[in-house]
From Swiss-Prot:
Biochemical pathway: Plant hormone biosynthesis; gibberellin biosynthesis; Secondary metabolite biosynthesis; terpenoid biosynthesis
Alphabetized InterPro entries for the sequence: Isoprenoid_synthase_dom_sf, Terpene_synth_N, Terpene_synth_N_sf, Terpene_synthase-like, Terpenoid_cyclase/PrenylTrfase
Residues binding substrate: 242, 466
GO molecular function, one term: terpene synthase activity
A GO biological process held by the record: gibberellin biosynthetic process
Native source species: Marrubium vulgare (White horehound)
SUPFAM superfamilies: Terpenoid cyclases/Protein prenyltransferases, Terpenoid synthases
Subcellular localization: Plastid, Chloroplast
Family per record: Belongs to the terpene synthase family.
Motif (DXDD motif): 379-382
Name by which UniProt lists this protein: ent-copalyl diphosphate synthase 2, chloroplastic
């Protein structure tokens, strides 16, 4: 049993866990019924620990005989009316987040005890003999943890030891707080052995360079601790190996990532040519935006620009300093990405536009971006994220920025000269490659590399990242691999990402662990959950109403099963989910249901001709009788009645005749075996969407979009179509939708073409079991 909304095809060529085909809907309906009926709040954690995007958990079993309507709509009105209090909370959260986005400056970031200690170790450059930044020592003394250590709330041995060594050295150097030093030394003694077993993937950036100098400093200060553990010896060996690989001439002449960890060369300071290195300073006076590296440079040179950078930080953060600053581009790009993936970006469109304008101002089509503006060094992580969010928000960016990261073997490195790969950075490269345009070969190669890398890591159960400790990175990667962006419906993606997003519990791995509160924010998560549940309650109410429409029209008597009705409504709700788009959503679902009903009639050629004659006659009679078609054909009458109500309920202008014209084109194509479904759905969405443009249908770009979308959806029905052709057409459609030009169509109108194409792709890509699981999660399983 297949639904004409999509195709019943089997094509092993296209990627995914199953061949592209439409699911058998009766099996799907029984599965959804069972899971919806068996769901309870105690099972709300289902899917949070793994992707589950295409394979439901063990709790999902097939049963028969349950009444889906009864199990899912009881108490819906009560839920809707009880959300009045949540609306106030939603409004409060929206205003709070808008304030965050409007006031973004250099970037919000947690303090680094390690970097603060390096700044605290700087002696008065005027020769006073004391610390030049005494407030840093106050910060250190005020931020010691109960166990005697310094560091992030997440206990990571690398992080706690490097922070604690640095802080106890700073305090001991200035003979301050001996009691705090004693507690810190006790912590070090008790935890040094844990270096032996810590996972290397959790080792902070440059740890093998930055930790040994602290160990040697501590020894010179007669701080006693065990220094013969296998883990420590291994770190020293890694340092020796890295030193042998350092291109000393290059690091003195061009900016490299070594500038970020210059303090790690404190034991070999005599090999550093500061006259050359200071020429590589960032415009703000820092060494690659690192307070610790800049503090070491200030110790060695007394440079005025280094001093000014550190003075600004100490004053800005009241004595503490972060491990990286500024991070203005990173904060804006990542925050926008999080809001979009959580499904709440519509509340912040003006603020997102400003964030994107800011990032685009510093974007280089040749080099990409780094976390901070004006950087002479770029990385693939920030470049990938910046590229994706800029392109999806309509900004002109070139993929040439990725060329510098590709090596001779076709692998993509995060930094030029890097020797190992990051899961999260490669994941973001993969996500950037998803939005490629036709002919962008560098992105095609990036997609090939990143797909294989991530698939291999998943197969080996090695989706542990060296740059971030997040709630469910394996789930994020799994979803992206299993559900390609072309097939990812907005509400499905939001549902999974809300469960994967860690909020303020996420820690990033720099030289120490750090937090980015404007990227990982509990308010984002709370708003996403509230909004999701509010939308879901409305969707459940609509599902009840569309069932009543189905019964009143007698569509069951024409062979339309309730399973097909559910699938039609789910696809519409998962694609066009916003409360204010209820009319569009219902119009799409009803149109799809009617199309399914008509095409399942198995009519002869003559019967089809009679149907069209009734349709044409009904149009004439409707015009003559003021809206009453007067036809004897029940299905034709249902079309006219439904179209009439759509026109009354969903638009500020009269769209009745335009909707009927769209239907007329469809029935004419249907009579001769044509395929006009996609065009009918697009026209229905755009007409019921209340476009401010009364006649966009004559626009040249509208016709282009319609042609490509129709071709894509038609291909997804053919069993012989090549994957490369579908991908090429999807790339062309994405380009038409996201690029802007003078005299262009409204972006909301263009997006509807992509919405329809992605819905066809989704239905062809995902298995019956997966779609059933998604229906439950999107429509019936409440977020807690």
């Amino acid at each position: 049993m297949s639904m004409t909304l999509f195709a019943s095809v089997t094509r092993p060529g296209l990627p995914g866990p199953t061949a592209l085909r439409f699911p058998e809907t009766r099996h799907l309906f029984h599965s959804v019924t069972a899971f919806a009926a068996s769901f309870s709040p105690s099972k709300s954690s289902v899917g949070s620990s793994q992707c589950n995007a295409t394979t439901p958990p063990a709790e999902y079993k097939e049963y028969t005989g349950n009444d889906l309507a009864k199990t899912t709509v009881d108490g819906i009105e009560k839920d809707i009316h009880s959300n009045k209090g949540l609306s106030d909370k939603t409004r409060e959260l929206v205003m709070s987040i808008r304030s965050i986005l409007r006031t973004m400056e250099e970037g919000e970031i947690s303090m680094s005890p390690y970097d603060t200690a390096w700044v605290a170790m700087v002696e008065d450059i005027d020769g006073g003999g004391g610390p030049h930044f005494p407030s840093t020592l106050d910060w250190i003394s005020s931020n010691q943890l109960a166990d005697g250590s310094w560091g992030d709330p997440i206990f990571l041995v690398y992080d706690r030891l490097i922070n604690t060594f640095a802080c106890v050295i700073a305090l001991t150097s200035w003979k301050m707080h001996p009691d705090k030093c004693d507690k810190a030394i006790s912590f070090i003694r008790e935890n040094m052995y844990k270096l032996d077993d810590e996972k290397e993937e959790r080792m902070p950036i440059g740890f093998e360079m930055t930790f040994p100098p602290l160990v040697e400093k501590a020894k010179r200060l007669n701080i006693n601790f065990p220094d013969d553990s296998p883990g420590l010896r291994k770190i020293y060996a890694q340092r020796d190996l890295k030193f042998k690989r350092i291109p000393w001439d290059k690091m003195h002449t061009v900016p490299t990532t070594l500038l970020y960890s210059l303090e790690g060369m404190a034991l070999e300071a005599d090999v550093l040519d500061w006259q050359k290195l200071l020429k590589l300073q960032s415009p703000d006076g820092s060494l690659f935006y690192s307070p610790a590296s800049t503090a070491f440079a200030l110790q060695q040179t007394g440079d005025h620009n280094c001093l000014q950078y550190l003075l600004k930080l100490v004053q800005t953060f009241n004595g503490g300093v972060p491990n990286l600053y500024p991070l203005d581009l990173y904060e804006r790009s990542w925050a926008v990405d999080r809001l979009q993936r959580l499904g709440i970006s519509r509340f912040f469109e003006p603020q997102i536009e400003e964030c994107m304008k800011y990032v685009h101002r510093y974007w280089s089509n040749k080099n990409g971006v780094y976390a901070a503006r004006h950087s002479d060094i770029q990385d693939i992580d920030d470049t990938s994220m910046g590229f994706r969010v800029l392109r999806l928000n309509g900004f002109d960016v070139s993929p040439d920025a990725f060329k510098q990261f590709e090596d001779d073997d076709g692998e993509f490195l995060c930094f030029i000269g890097q020797t190992n790969h990051s899961v999260s950075a490669t994941y973001n490269l993969y996500r950037a490659s998803q939005v490629m345009f036709p002919g962008e070969e560098i992105l095609q190669r990036a997609k090939k590399f990143s797909t294989k890398f991530l698939q291999d890591k998943r197969a080996e159960n090695e989706l542990l990242d060296k740059w971030v400790i997040t709630k469910d990175l394996p789930g994020e990667v799994g979803y992206a691999l299993d559900v390609p962006w072309y097939a990812s419906l907005p509400r499905v993606e939001a549902r999974f990402y809300i469960e994967q997003y860690g909020g303020e519990d996420v820690a990033w791995i720099g030289k120490v662990l750090f937090r980015a509160p404007n990227v990982n924010n509990d308010n984002y998560l709370e708003l996403a959950k509230l909004d999701y549940n509010d939308c879901q309650a409305l969707h459940q109410h609509e599902w009840k109403n569309i069932q009543q429409w189905y019964k009143s029209c007698g569509l069951r008597g024409f062979g339309l099963g309730e399973e097909s009705l559910l699938l039609a409504y789910y696809i519409a709700a998962a694609s066009v989910f916003e409360p204010e788009k209820s009319g569009e959503r219902l119009a799409w679902a009803k149109t799809a249901a009617l199309v399914k009903t008509i095409t399942s009639q198995k009519l002869t050629k003559d019967q089809k001709h009679d149907f069209i004659r009734e349709f044409e006659q009904g149009s004439i009679l409707e015009n003559a009788n003021g809206g009453r078609c007067g036809t004897s054909n029940k299905l034709v009458e249902t079309i006219f009645t439904t179209v009439h109500k759509m026109s009354l309920e969903t638009s500020s202008r009269d769209i009745h005749h335009q909707l009927l014209h769209a239907w007329r084109k469809w029935v004419v194509a249907w009579e001769v075996g044509g395929d006009g479904d996609a065009e009918l759905f697009v026209q229905t969405l755009n007409l019921t969407g209340g476009s401010s443009e009364p006649t966009p249908f004559c626009h040249p770009k509208y016709q282009q979009l319609l042609e490509v979308t129709t071709r894509i959806c038609h291909q997804l029905r053919k069993s012989t179509v090549k994957e490369i052709q579908v991908e090429s057409d999807m790339q062309e459609l994405v380009k038409l939708v996201v690029t802007k030009s003078s005299g262009d169509l409204d972006s909301d109108i263009k997006q509807k073409f992509l919405t329809i194409a992605r819905s066809f792709y989704y239905a062809a890509h995902c298995s019956t079991e997966a779609i059933g699981f998604h229906i439950v999660k999107v429509l019936f399983e409440r977020l807690v």
